[in-house]
Amino acid sequence: MRKSGILMHISSLPSKYGIGKMGKSAYDFVDFLVSAGVKCWQILPLSPTSYGDSPYQSFSVYAGNPYFIDFETLKREGLIKKSDYEDIKWQDNDHQVNYSIIYNNCFKVLRQAYKTYKRDISKRYKTFVEKNSSWLDDYALFMALKFKNNGKPWYEWDKKLAMRDSNALKKASEELEKETEFFKFIQYKFFRQWSNLKKYANDKGVEIIGDMPIYVSSILIVSSGIKGTGPYLLSSNQ
């Protein structure tokens, strides 16, 4: 059976905050598709972007992009105040995404949300972490290490960490426990918002056609989300 569809990535939705988000504009777009009789919404990979900011080159094939988390939703949940994100200059113009601005500010807002949330970690959050531990633990630690190393690629880190030495990873996990929890929290909020948006679309009769990152880069090698993955399993020049 033939169906009509439109390609519109989350990043291209209208937003005052530099990049499209899973908030009102996303739900409005679903309503537009319904009114136009469009049955399929095609999107690009939802994974966090890496150097170059292509949705097809990511830190993980499992994780979601923090940039798409809607601030207004976090505000309604009581996790942040409007002043936490409204007073930030998110873009240079209305037609292009400035990823440097977003990178430098998005995590500040999300840290404020986490600071509020961690006072009362919910059962739902704990269930999410346990259910996704097969990839989430490695991903969160990788991101914590990447931030600690000022965004440098893994091959410029301490050699033992880069080669996934078990003792070095154990020590890093203990030292960066709070930071890894922050990145787990980000994924929890992403998938909560994404699940709600997807359900809304599906309930309205709109199917979502997804995609996945296909370019394995050197920064993906130790953060693919597969237990035991290390640079000795993949070659970055093949």
Identify the role of each PLM range:
Residues 1-227:
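Acidic/aromatic-lined carbohydrate-recognition and catalytic surfaces
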Residues 231-238:
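Catalytic cores of eukaryotic secretory-pathway lumenal/extracellular enzymes that build
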